[in-house]
From Swiss-Prot:
GO CC annotations on file: cytosolic small ribosomal subunit
Record HAMAP family: Ribosomal_uS2_B (MF_00291_B)
Pfam families, per database record: Ribosomal_S2
Keywords: Ribonucleoprotein, Ribosomal protein
Record region (Disordered): 232-267
Molecular functions (GO terms): structural constituent of ribosome
Biological source species: Stenotrophomonas maltophilia (strain R551-3)
One of the GO BP terms on file: translation
Classification of source organism: Bacteria, Pseudomonadati, Pseudomonadota, Gammaproteobacteria, Lysobacterales
Protein's name in the database: Small ribosomal subunit protein uS2
Name of encoding gene: rpsB
Length: 267
């Protein structure tokens, strides 16, 4: 399991929450106190939950499952892409398209179109077209690449989702919960940790903190892959409608009754 110390979390600013006026009472057990109207997260509570989350990610990868890395806010985009690519997992870092999970068959059609356009660029098809047609096709390709490029090799629904900011990615989390896909997420002091299966109490804005979470998640994936049995894998169905059963968490999260506080805040 990736080793991240409390000192590393302190140096990355993981302990800085949002302004006290925006807090969610469900986060009370994880808050140490306040400093200058900013909540301070208790890292003694964060560390074990962080370790649980990383262990789960590793277990999914060990079973040859897929973990979708998700972070579309500006501070997370670059890191999410880099770390997902490093560990060979799909990602979305620009904009979540509604229905990406719940309407996955349609999304796959868009992915197929993206691959068709990419092939046309390399096999000489574009050379047979007039200039304005080529420009139009390239614009279409670039648009699809920006929104779907990170998941174009994801042939079935993911077995888990790793999320940086649950408020920013609330639609994705609702889709995942509807389909029973486990969610591992960083939860700041202004949101409800009960909305996800594996909550990591921590700063979801600071770039260094985002890098720490994402790097650890990628390391957990690589560790799980390294421990995976080398037996031949069973062929995956092209359009699976649900995640693998054995990748679901062993324990159930408490009932999700409270809605997340949608107040905007600056850490």
């Amino acid at each position: 399991m990736p080793q991240v110390t409390m000192r590393q979390m302190l140096e990355a600013g993981v302990h800085f929450g949002h302004q006290t006026r925006y807090w969610n009472p469900k986060m009370a057990p994880y808050i140490f106190g306040a400093r200058g109207k900013i909540h301070i997260i208790n890292l003694e509570k964060t560390v074990p939950l962080f370790n649980d989350a990383m262990n789960f990610i590793s277990s999914v990868a060990q079973k040859r499952g897929t973990v979708l890395f998700l972070g579309t806010k500006r501070s997370a985009r670059e890191t999410i892409k880099e770390e997902a690519e490093r560990c060979g997992m799909p990602f979305m870092n620009q904009r979540w398209l509604g229905g990406t999970l719940t309407n996955f068959r349609t999304v796959k059609q868009s992915v197929a179109r993206l691959k068709e356009l990419e092939a046309g660029e390399t096999d000489g098809t574009f050379e047979k077209l007039v200039k304005h047609e080529v420009l139009g096709l390239r614009r279409e390709r670039d648009k699809l690449e920006a929104s779907l490029g990170g998941i174009k090799d994801m042939n079935r629904l993911p077995d888990a989702i790793f999320v940086i900011d649950i408020g920013h990615e609330d639609i994705a989390i609702k889709e995942a919960k509807k389909l029973g896909i486990p969610v591992i997420a960083v939860v700041d002091t202004n949101y409800n940790p009960e909305l996800v299966d594996y909550a990591i109490p921590g700063n979801d804005d600071a770039i260094r903190a985002v890098q720490l979470y994402s790097r650890a998640a990628a390391d957990a994936v690589l560790e799980g892959k390294a421990a995976a049995p080398h037996a031949a894998t069973v062929r995956e169905e092209e359009f699976a409608d649900a995640p693998a059963e054995d990748a679901k968490p062993a324990r159930r999260a408490p009932a999700k009754k409270a809605a997340a506080d949608k107040g905007e805040a600056q850490a």
